[in-house]
Each structure stands twice: as C-alpha cells, then as structure tokens.
A protein has these predicted regions:
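Exported/periplasmic ABC-transporter solute-binding proteins
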Residues: 27-62, 67-77, 84-85, 91-93, ...
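Bacterial N-terminal signal peptides
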Residues: 11-21
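Bacterial N-terminal signal peptides that target proteins for export
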Residues: 2-12
C-alpha cells in the first residue's frame, strides 16, 4: 500500500468518524427527554408521539415511580411533569439545581373517583357507601395522592366520617398508584379503590368508575416545568406549549382530564 493510499484511507476514516460524531450530536439535539409519574403518562406519551411526528423529532418519555427514572433525569431531563403540586415540590428536592420550582405551570385538573369491581357488586353509588362496615377500600399514601383520603373524608368537618372510612381502609396503604394497581389486581377481596378518575380511563378492564359525589370531590393538577437544560432548547419549549394548546387539550381530555 503506497503512501497516497494510506493518507486517503486515513483521511476517509477521520471524515467518517467526524460525520458519525456530528450525526450523533444532531440526533441528541433533535430529541428531548421528559420525565414524570405514571398517572399523567398516557396523555403525555400520546402528546409526545403527535408532537414528535409533526416536528420530525423524538420526544422520549420516561414515566412511573420516581426511583425508576430519577438518576437518568439528573443527567438529561429537559422537562419534568407531575401528578400533583406536592409531587413537583418533591421533584425539585430530588433534582436539586435542575429547575426553578417557581417556573412550574399547572396544566389540567382531574377529580378523585371511586373505582369498583366490574359490575359493581357492592352497589356503591357514592362516598358514604364506603363507610359501610363490610366494605374494604384501597388507598394510596404517597406520590400524587399524599393525604388524599384524609382530604376527601374530612371535607365536611365531621370526624366520625374520617373514623368510619379509616376503619375500612386496607393496610398498609399502597406507596403509589402503580403499587395500588397491583394490589387491586391481586387482592380480589378489595371492594373499592379511592384514586383519580384517570386510572380507570387508562385501565377500563380492571374497574368501573363511580364519580365522586359532592361535597367529597376534590381535584389535583398535573404540572410541567422546563429544566435549565430544556430552557435552552426551543423544541422543549415548543412541546410544553403544545401540551397546553387545543391539540394538547384534546389529548388530555381523551384521557379523563378536565380541560376547561
């Protein structure tokens, strides 16, 4: 092999290496990384797919219990979404220096609901039916439902209602909605599940929904925030705008969120 051929091959290899590096960098710039809990995930994922297709880019969504994605989010999160205001505060603590909590934007609300077994064998029609001694109720103690059952049961200021409801709760409480779903699937003797309505929309085969009656109905929101990294990316900003656009509202409405 002569010197000219060697130089040519070396130059070609260097060019291909640089091209691959540039291609990888371009691909990274064309992707945004989104992290958050499982509750809002079906709507976020559908929105990500629609936005990505329209803009010829990738929107990566990692959702579920925080411990499954928090380490990766520390490295490359552009956007973080939550299932309640207390969750966004927790994410700010878990991702120190990643974003300004004051920049978080509430997007949509959803109501608490009562999920029952298919066919509603206990004939549950409202919250007071959950106070009957023979009813077993599944609740969640953490994530976006921290304090949820107490807020619902305490709405009237009647401590007797709080006491009666607590006696019917299944202990220990589920740590998050995903764990609650597993309990609901495995423990067939549980009669009702106090959770956000969106979980029935996403899992219609597992339960029927009984809308929460007043005065016990409460709402919590899903919020979104750009990280400092994401704030430097126009496409990340555009995706946040898309989530709250008419097209985004339609998607969230499909998954049970109140988009008024």
């Amino acid at each position: 092999m002569n010197q000219y051929t060697k130089r040519f091959l070396t130059s070609t290899a260097l060019f291909l290496s640089l091209a691959a590096t540039c291609s990888t960098a371009a691909t990274a710039q064309d992707a945004i990384n989104v992290y958050g809990p499982g509750g809002p995930a079906p709507a976020i994922q559908e929105a990500a797919k629609a936005f990505g297709a329209a803009n010829q880019m990738t929107v990566n969504v990692a959702a579920g219990p925080t411990n499954q994605w928090i380490d990766k989010a520390k490295q490359d999160a552009d956007i973080v979404f939550s299932g309640a205001e207390n969750m966004m505060t927790d994410f700010a603590k878990a991702l120190p220096g990643a974003f300004d909590l004051a920049d978080a934007q509430p997007m949509y609300l959803r109501p608490v609901a009562i999920l029952v077994r298919p066919g509603n064998p206990k004939k549950i029609r409202g919250f007071r039916d959950l106070l009957v001694p023979s009813v077993k109720v599944l609740t969640v103690a953490g994530a976006g439902q921290t304090g949820l059952w107490e807020d619902v049961a305490g709405r009237t200021g009647d401590i007797a209602i709080v006491r009666a409801f607590r006696k019917n709760m299944v202990f220990p409480e589920a740590a998050n909605s995903g764990a609650a779903k597993q309990h609901w699937t495995e423990q067939k003797d549980i009669d009702a599940w106090l959770i956000w309505n969106i979980w029935q929309v996403a899992n219609p085969e597992l339960a029927q929904v009984v809308p929460m009656d007043e005065p016990f109905r409460i709402y919590r929101d899903t919020g979104v925030v750009l990280t400092y990294k994401g704030s430097a990316q126009p496409k990340a900003k555009a995706f946040v705008d898309f989530l709250q656009s008419p097209a985004g509202q339609k998607i969230f409405g499909k998954w049970g969120w109140d988009t008024r």
